[in-house]
């Protein structure tokens, strides 16, 4: 796949930085895994919406790189963890996520958000792209378990963004950046659940925002938060909104209310 943009910016220097990282990662995996068939980049970078920032003249990918490694044989957790350690030692990234799928199990892949993204919104870094043909068609209509998953997965982001110093004004610029990043994860999580509930899942952050503004236009606070979170995700900046505390409290209420209503088996939307 040529001329792939790993972020929405379509900048040659951004793509070069990511590609250099991926070349190192590919070499490490191929050297360590004898029967590797494919290395697939999933997540934001895999669908051309990776979070990246230019800070103090340095190009910095934010969050993590997510990979699916296709092999003939099962990879143990030890092997995967050893690969992660080597990658983290050589590449300037906060975290590496690796999922191993055996070739024989591709045909058994079930309907899920992760598998939908793997099939339709990923970047094949290494191996024959015909491997995708082994993955069955996946419906964008998700099960109830999948709908609720983002509410729980990103609940941790809500907790991590809690103002431990009791006042966000005491935070440094960098601290505010990471706090706001966690807040936006929470926002993107509950908004994805709402879209899944109406059978409107889309891998793209940009498309999700457009769909949310369309289908939930009567929920002005929610629409505003989703727009803010999406803009930050795709166009990272160190300049964080001044009303950070207000955003946290509004978001907390929406996230927890959605979760509460879900558990009480009411219409959460």
Ranges and model annotations:
Residues 26-65, 70-75:
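Active-site nucleotide-donor binding segment shared across nucleotidyl transfer reactions
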Residues 1-34:
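N-terminal regions immediately upstream of nucleotidyltransferase
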Residues 5-17, 80-185, 189-193, 197, ...:
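Conserved NTP/Mg2+-binding pocket subregion across the NTase superfamily
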Residues 242-243:
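Compositionally biased, intrinsically disordered linkers/stalks adjacent to structured regions
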């Amino acid at each position: 796949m040529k001329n792939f943009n790993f972020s929405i910016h379509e900048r040659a220097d951004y793509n070069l930085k990511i590609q250099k990282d991926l070349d190192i990662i590919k070499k490490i995996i191929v050297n360590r895994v004898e029967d590797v068939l494919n290395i697939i980049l999933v997540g934001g970078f895999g669908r051309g919406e990776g979070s990246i920032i230019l800070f103090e003249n340095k190009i910095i990918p934010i969050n993590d790189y997510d990979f699916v490694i296709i092999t003939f044989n099962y990879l143990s957790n030890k092997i995967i963890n050893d690969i992660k350690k080597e990658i983290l030692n050589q590449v300037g990234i906060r975290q590496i996520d690796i999922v191993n799928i055996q070739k024989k199990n591709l045909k058994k892949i079930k309907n899920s958000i992760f598998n939908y993204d793997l099939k339709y919104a990923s970047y094949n870094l290494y191996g024959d792209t015909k491997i995708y043909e082994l993955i069955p068609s996946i419906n964008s209509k998700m099960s109830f378990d999948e709908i609720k998953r983002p509410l729980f997965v990103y609940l941790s982001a809500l907790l991590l963004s809690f103002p431990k110093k009791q006042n966000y004004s005491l935070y440094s610029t960098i601290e505010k950046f990471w706090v706001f990043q966690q807040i936006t994860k929470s926002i993107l999580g509950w908004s994805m659940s709402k879209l899944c509930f109406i059978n409107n899942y889309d891998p793209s952050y940009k498309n999700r925002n457009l769909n949310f503004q369309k289908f939930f236009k009567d929920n002005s606070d929610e629409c505003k938060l989703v727009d803010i979170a999406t803009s930050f995700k795709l166009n990272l900046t160190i300049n964080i909104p001044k009303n950070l505390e207000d955003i946290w409290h509004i978001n907390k209420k929406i996230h927890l209310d959605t979760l509460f209503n879900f558990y009480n088996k009411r219409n959460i939307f």
